[in-house]
UniProtKB/Swiss-Prot annotation:
GO terms for biological process: positive regulation of translation; translation; translational initiation. Gene3D superfamilies: P-loop containing nucleotide triphosphate hydrolases. One of its GO terms (cellular component) is nucleoplasm. It is found in: Cytoplasm; Nucleus, Nucleoplasm; Nucleus envelope. ATP 1 binds at residues 330-337. PROSITE patterns: ABC_TRANSPORTER_1, ABC_TRANSPORTER_2. This is ATP-binding cassette sub-family F member 1. Residues 136-149 have a biased composition (Acidic residues). ATP 2 binds at residues 652-659. The modification Phosphothreonine is found at residue 195. Interacts (via N-terminus) with EIF2S1; the interaction is independent of its phosphorylated status. Associates (via both ABC transporter domains) with the ribosomes. Residues 47-64, 150-162, 206-223, 553-574 have a biased composition (Basic and acidic residues).
């Protein structure tokens, strides 16, 4: 049988046979030979193994060289030599890149119009966009945002290297073909961005290089990997040297703001060491303010004050009219004292013709008698007296020209009231509690509180245009407060007072300045009038807030988002404001309207637990005589008792023994004769004027109550909160609390003791007005006995206390009310009581 045609062999034996495929990359079927080289499969394998071994050897040598280079660069970095080399290399690369970008860019005039220009056939079209000019323009911005750009650009670098790496590994023919296609695509673009231009430049530079020779691809790959490692190493060193590399953008901005504030504080320290913790800014003086520079009124607009990084005043306005008496009120710690200090130091723009005095420091302790310390405050009078003495000496020597000058000096002395100066000084000192012997006593023999009274007497004697008093009643007894209250009601110059004594503010002030929300708000009338107006204002604000919230709720129900609803509401407020502004064209522009916030009332409530009933008398002194060693007795034959419903206020001048009487009642002092008797079940709660001595300063308020009364943590915090201690202060060491906060801790301790009798020695010191009101309400609701020593007239009158006067070594009850006692005190000093009606 004839044989059929011979079967054709299968299709091409070579896999991947193409234009750019090297013989080494061809795959041969088992048992076949290459028609060109006539090599067997095993010979091909041997050749490949040999080439692979050589390449592996070269690769190892390259890696060793790279490791040596990296170690050398690390050593150079330690020695500080590497930075110069890197900068030189970077400068060279940057110059090459800039020259390349300059060739690709067009003039700036072409960049403005960007009208496409027809290109003649056969010519290349210039690339659009002036990349070089754009880089020059943004160079400073890129330097500023270098830290922010790094996280964005870092992932792009490996991608760029991968592109170059892929181009290097592609066959030469395919790479050239692909490069032509990419080049033609680049011509079709009119306005490439700076990033695209950089990419095209990298590709063009890659194309211009010679095609890689066999066996060089891996070398190039290794070199590129080495350069990539160097770049990553540089970035790692930058991050290691940058202490803020781990911070986010928000944290960096916050840190920058804090550093700016610290620099501002440092500059302020250099300028004025007295105000080293404060920052003040004030708007430029307007034309209206410039007109008032020579007037007696003060008008400061748009000033801001910050202390320790905390903003106290923001765009606030200060208006003070000559001859008015202002009371500055507001919660503790909001900047009232800071404002007084800035006015006194003229950190704010006070008119130069207004002399300002802030009474805040006690007089120097020296040999100067108290009355002379007051008289020497009037430097003009002292200068005239010295001139008088000098001219009298010249006149005695026969100088006739001195007579005319001496007459002028006498006229000035009469005009200033120099003859009555000493009588005036002694009257002021007597009103503040100095008897004739004390007025002639050297100041170094007085305590700090009495030297503070001398300082207050100096301020009253000088009568500045603007007198500022910061808590003037804190160092005074009730009698001195009564005299000062009456004296200031006749003050004819401008007065600015910070005080927590509501009765004092009601009697003295004609206007109230309320510090609220970092601004100053003004009310005509005394504190009682302000309180009514403020409460009415808060009610109106609450109604407006509820109306606003209702409108926002309706807008949200209609499909608006919260942001859209708030924006629409603000637009309505803006239109209303513009309408009002058109009606009142004379008024200055107001701040842009903001959405209302819920009004928050500052409320404090004190509570003391009611005691169980006890049979009277629960406490008393019987036949008691007491005196300190080496001194005459303070009391002789005291005999009185106290019941559970007693409300007693002990009054009298300083030094007569009011605090000593309280210590005898509590059993802390033992009588010289007689005895203190009390019910065996009686528990006494004592608030000492030196209350800080009974606290453990290293403990927190919560720990102090937990240890003393075995209270759970939450119960201790609730007790502290009831007496107005802020929650953040519950876990702070007591030594770091303010005086008012420490006082609240003591009141919380008294409540935990569940006393049957409250004995309070000057409890209103360091308390604000709201807390004093809360204390008065708590005393009225308390079912036990109360004995109090206080200089706060309103606390005395609000609690309906009986007045017991300490005088002449005994204690006696007054027939009449508090006004009767005031009249007696003023008559004893030779003063006439001012009966100014309260508004």
């Amino acid at each position: 049988m004839p044989k059929g045609p011979k079967q054709q062999p299968p299709e091409p034996e070579w896999i991947g046979d193409g234009e750019g495929t090297s013989p080494a990359d061809k795959v041969v079927k088992k048992g076949k030979k290459d028609k060109k080289t006539k090599k067997t499969f095993f010979e091909e394998l041997a050749v490949e193994d040999k080439q692979a071994g050589e390449e592996e050897k070269l690769q190892k040598e390259k890696e060793q060289q790279q490791q040596q280079q990296q170690q050398k660069k690390k050593r150079d970095t330690r020695k500080g030599r590497r930075k110069k080399d890197v900068d030189d290399d970077d400068d060279g690369d940057e110059r090459v890149l800039m020259e390349r970008l300059k060739q690709l860019s067009v003039p700036a005039s072409d960049e403005e119009d960007e009208v496409p220009v027809p290109v003649p056939r056969g010519r290349k079209k210039a690339k659009g966009g002036n990349v070089f000019e754009a880089l020059i323009q943004d160079e400073s911005e890129e330097e500023k945002e270098e830290e922010e750009e790094k996280p964005v650009l870092k992932p792009a670098k490996p991608e760029k290297n991968r592109i170059n790496k892929a181009v290097a590994e592609e066959p030469p023919g395919l790479r050239n073909k692909k490069g032509k296609e990419e080049k033609s695509k680049g011509k079709a673009k009119n306005k490439p961005s700076a990033t695209d231009s950089e990419g095209e430049d990298d590709e063009d530079m890659t194309k211009e290089k010679e095609p890689p020779r066999p066996g060089k691809d891996k070398d190039k790959k290794g070199a590129e990997q080495g350069s990539e490692e160097e770049k990553e190493e540089k970035e790692g060193e930058v991050k290691a040297n940058d202490p803020y590399a781990h911070l986010s953008k928000k944290e960096k901005k916050k840190l920058k703001k804090q550093m700016d504030y610290e620099r501002q504080v440092e500059s302020l320290k250099a300028a004025n060491a007295a105000e080293n913790d404060f920052s003040v800014s004030q708007a430029e003086v307007s034309s209206r303010q410039a007109m008032l520079e020579n007037a007696s009124d003060i008008k400061l607009e748009k000033f801001s004050i910050s202390a320790h990084g905390k903003e106290l005043f923001v765009n606030a306005d200060l208006y003070i009219v000559a001859g008015r008496r202002y009371g500055l009120v507001g919660p503790n710690g909001k900047g009232k004292t800071t404002l007084l200090k800035h006015i006194a130091n003229r950190a704010l723009s006070i008119p130069p013709n207004i002399d300002v005095l802030l009474c805040e420091q006690e007089v120097v302790a020296d040999e100067t008698p108290a009355v002379q310390a007051v008289l020497r405050a009037d430097t003009k009078r002292l200068r005239l007296l010295e001139e008088e003495k000098r001219l009298q000496g010249q006149l005695e020597q026969g100088d006739d020209t001195a007579a005319e000058k001496l007459e002028k000096v006498y006229e000035e002395l009469r005009a200033t009231g120099a003859a009555a100066a000493e009588a005036k000084a002694r009257r002021i000192l007597a009103g503040l509690g100095f008897d004739p012997e004390m007025q002639n006593r050297p100041t170094q023999k007085f305590s700090g509180g009495w030297r503070m009274r001398v300082s207050l007497a100096r301020a009253l004697f000088m009568e500045p245009t603007l007198l500022m008093l910061d808590e003037p009643t804190n160092h005074l007894d009730l009698n001195a407060v009564i005299w000062l209250n009456n004296y200031l009601q006749g003050w004819r110059k401008t007065l600015l007072i910070v005080s927590h004594d509501q009765g004092f503010l009601d009697d003295v002030c004609t206007d109230i300045i309320h510090l609220d929300t970092q601004r100053l708000h003004y009310y005509r009338g005394n504190y009682m009038t302000f309180k009514k107006m403020y409460q009415q204002k808060q009610k109106e604000l609450l109604k407006q807030y509820e109306k606003q919230e209702k409108k926002l709720k309706e807008l949200k129900a209609g499909g608006k988002s919260t942001k859209q609803a708030e924006k629409q509401t603000k637009e309505v407020l803006t239109r209303k404001q513009q309408k009002c502004r058109r009606k009142n064209q004379d008024e200055e522009s107001q701040d842009p309207p903001e959405l209302l916030k819920r009004p928050r009332e500052y409320t404090v409530r004190f509570t003391f637990p009611d005691p169980p009933p006890l049979s009277p008398p629960v406490l008393g002194l019987h036949g008691v005589t007491f005196g300190y060693e080496g001194q005459k007795p303070l009391f002789k034959n005291l005999d009185f008792g106290i019941d559970m419903d007693s409300r007693i206020c002990i009054v009298g001048p300083n030094g007569v023994g009011k605090s000593t009487l309280l210590l005898l009642l509590t059993g802390k002092l033992t009588p010289t004769n007689g005895e203190m008797r009390k019910n065996h079940r009686l528990k006494i709660g004592f608030f000492n004027q030196q209350y800080a001595e009974q606290l453990h300063m290293e403990e927190t308020p919560t720990e102090y109550l937990q240890r003393g009364f075995n209270l759970p943590y939450q119960d201790a915090r609730k007790c502290l909160g009831r007496f107005g201690l802020e929650s953040h202060a519950h876990t702070i060491q007591i030594c770091k609390l303010s005086g008012g906060q420490k006082a609240r801790v003591v009141f919380a301790e008294l409540a935990c003791r569940e006393p049957d009798v409250l004995i309070l020695d000057e409890p209103t010191n360091n308390l604000d007005i709201e807390s004093i009101d809360a204390l008065g309400e708590a005393i009225n609701e308390y079912k036990g006995a109360v004995i109090v020593v206080s200089h706060d007239a309103r606390l005395i009158t609000e609690t309906n206390c009986q007045l017991w006067v300490v005088e002449e070594q005994s204690v006696s009850q007054i027939d009449g009310d508090f006004d009767d006692y005031k009249r007696e005190v003023l008559e004893a000093l030779g003063e006439v009581m001012v009966n100014r009606p309260r508004d």
